[in-house]
A protein has these predicted regions:
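Hydrophobic alpha-helical membrane-insertion signals
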Residues: 1-37
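Accessory beta-strand-rich segments of carbohydrate-active enzymes
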Residues: 5-10, 24-29, 60, 65-66, ...
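Disulfide-rich extracellular domains of secreted proteins
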Residues: 19, 42-44, 112
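Generic short amphipathic/hydrophobic targeting helices enriched at N-termini
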Residues: 40-42, 79
Length: 181
């Protein structure tokens, strides 16, 4: 006798696209660097942190506060992600698993607002902004001084109120994915 297993149902399966490769980023402002920051875009993969780590075994961080812009262009077609009429009723979500400290998200010109992300996950319904073909995702990552509206985590380097270096990198420091459900 033979054992038969059912075929995987593709129609209702959750689809995930990793958006970790080929980002462009640059700093628009950075404390302590006084104009010495990157003014031209560099290409990076996610996770990325603008705050460098220095010293023996790279345990001492640079305490970098500032703002960085991240841009990613990605192309979607039906064979990749089922966006057209064949996927009627599906919802599409961008999931950010860590952006330090605040993230302002724009997809194809639609502003999704500023969010206190930090070390938490942010999920946005982008169904109405996503399209077949080329899509442009822009993330403004901000890590200002004196953060007062986020949980404080001692980075081990200061007792100053609102001081969160060591706990919040400047950048997109965890995965970003697009999901269809």
């Amino acid at each position: 006798s033979q054992v038969h297993f059912p075929e995987r149902e593709v129609k209702n399966r959750r689809m995930v696209m990793e958006l970790d490769k080929g980002w462009k980023t640059w700093l628009t402002e950075a404390t302590h660097l006084k104009g010495l920051f990157a003014q031209k875009a560099i290409e990076v993969n996610i996770p990325h942190n603008w705050d460098d780590y220095y010293g023996y075994r790279q345990l001492t961080h640079g305490n970098l506060h500032g703002t960085a812009i991240y841009e990613k262009t990605f192309t979607l077609d039906d064979s990749q992600f089922l966006i057209s009429n064949s996927s009627f009723g599906k919802r599409y979500f961008l999931r950010f698993e860590g952006v330090g400290t605040y993230a302002t998200i724009t997809l194809n010109g639609k502003d999704f607002g500023r969010h206190p992300v930090g070390r938490t996950t942010l999920t946005l319904d982008v169904t109405d902004a996503l399209k077949l073909g080329e899509n442009k995702l822009v993330v403004k990552a901000e890590h200002p001084e004196m953060i007062a509206d986020m949980p404080w985590v001692c980075g081990g380097c200061s007792s100053e109120w609102g001081f969160s270096e060591g706990s919040q990198p400047l950048g997109i420091f965890r995965p970003v994915v697009l999901e269809a459900t």
